[in-house]
Amino acid sequence: MKKQRIAVKIGSSSLADSHGGISKEQLSDHVAALARLKEEGHEVLLITSGAVAAGFSALGYPSRPVTIKGKQAAAAVGQSLLMQAYTEEFRKYGIVTAQLLLTRSDFSRKEQYSNAYATLGELLNRSALPIINENDSISLEELTFGDNDMLSALVSGLVSADMLMIFTDVNGLYDQNPQKNADAKKYHFLPEVTEEIASLAGDAGSKLGTGGMKSKIDAAKTALSLGVSVFIGTGCGQEKFLDVMKGKGDGTYIGNAPQKVIKMNKQWIALHSLVSGQIEVDAGAATAIIQHGKSLLPAGVTSVSGFFQVDEVVEVITQQGRVIGKGQCTYSAEELRNLKGMQSQDIQARGERHNYEVIHRDHWVSF
């Protein structure tokens, strides 16, 4: 089996004991299986939940707190306990671990996003095992990643992982709720996530987690769009992750391999960037961008909305108001208003800078 880059997401329900604390047995089982992946030469990233589950009992909560401040306080206590437990277990296998705590803002700000990309790449090159969690204790929004399901999809895309394994307490996707319907049919393989498949998932997670099957399907759809194939399921024993790679996993495989890899910069534009303005283009420019993969030139711009600066992200719309994509603009809004509709030679004749496209195709994403 060739060397692959594997992202594994382990949810709270797969880590916690019956009282809500961290189960040493379950954690040890996961670590042993992750160590086997490393032993076989694969690069491994772990996206783990469990900080709230690990910390709430230490603060005297009888069960998982439901308020934001309660969750964040429990996460502040539990994250160190969770990381300590992982570090001690991985040390038995001679594996160096690294902790990364991320928030939504780390993805929306390009410099931080690029830094996360560089750091993860260096850790993997140095054979360390990154352990990633949302920085729950300081997040401004209420644990928005959905038990880290979406976080795992975004991270797996960021590092161009070959596969994302989402491990949970359910062995895959079914056409009905298997707990309520004995005749429920399990999907062993899905080429893609359709609207029909997405509609089958419920919203609720377990008492120990925040993400139900819906968040996992949403994460799978995002991962596929970033070129990462997905497995959703369960398992036990040190061979469970290797079994998934061999096609013997107890769950659902999603996506045909190999997937098309999306460059880091385009991932950021498509999924994380904040739109600062809008550019309207004529029919010829729209066709050139969408059908022929060309860059957008000033001649094709018909109007400019907003007050964006150089290199900020803008939406591009047709004259009928349809959004066709977005990209990083090499002009400020003020500059572009003065140059819209002009041919390159006319811009050059005016002494304006003329060797920049409005949006280069390498910094453009079509919708």
Curated annotation (Swiss-Prot):
It comes from the Bacteria. Its main location: cytoplasm. GO terms for molecular function: ATP binding; glutamate 5-kinase activity; RNA binding. Pathway: Amino-acid biosynthesis; L-proline biosynthesis; L-glutamate 5-semialdehyde from L-glutamate: step 1/2. Substrate binds at residues 49, 136, 148. The keyword Transmembrane helix does not apply. GO terms for cellular component: cytosol. ATP binds at residues 9, 168-169, 210-216. It catalyses: L-glutamate + ATP = L-glutamyl 5-phosphate + ADP. It is found in: Cytoplasm. Keywords: Amino-acid biosynthesis, ATP-binding, Cytoplasm, Kinase, Nucleotide-binding, Proline biosynthesis, Transferase. Residues 276-350 form the PUA domain. GO terms for biological process: L-proline biosynthetic process. Catalyzes the transfer of a phosphate group to glutamate to form L-glutamate 5-phosphate. This is Glutamate 5-kinase. It comes from Bacillus mycoides (strain KBAB4). The gene is proB.
